[in-house]
């Protein structure tokens, strides 16, 4: 993808708009394939950006009201994304023990 700086720049553009639709080239966090993308910043050496975009997704797209999920909660996928991200963790690599680390919502 052109190196860490290029990856970070492309991710910044990708997260300019949240949930603009499944056919948009911007982030659509209401679908499972997008759930791990905020943690790609960690692997590009920009963990503060992971923390910033995850908190933005939590604040803007999730709520405790009916319809408070940004998409279809297929088998609890979006709910578990929220719980993991609120803990400041994400199982970024399936089948590998360990987590990508973010910023916990709680003290």
What label would you give each PLM region?
Residues 3-5, 9-20, 25-107:
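Non-catalytic C-terminal accessory modules of carbohydrate-active enzymes
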């Amino acid at each position: 993808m052109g190196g860490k700086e290029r990856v970070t720049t492309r991710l910044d553009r990708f997260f300019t708009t949240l949930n603009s639709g499944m056919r948009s080239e911007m982030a659509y966090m209401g679908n499972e394939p997008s759930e791990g993308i905020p943690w790609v910043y960690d692997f590009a050496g920009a963990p503060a950006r992971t923390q910033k975009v995850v908190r933005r997704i939590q604040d803007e797209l999730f709520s405790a009201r009916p319809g408070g999920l940004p998409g279809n909660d297929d088998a609890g996928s979006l709910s578990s994304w929220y719980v993991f991200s609120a803990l400041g963790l994400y199982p970024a690599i399936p089948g590998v023990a360990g987590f990508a680390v973010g910023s916990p919502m709680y003290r």
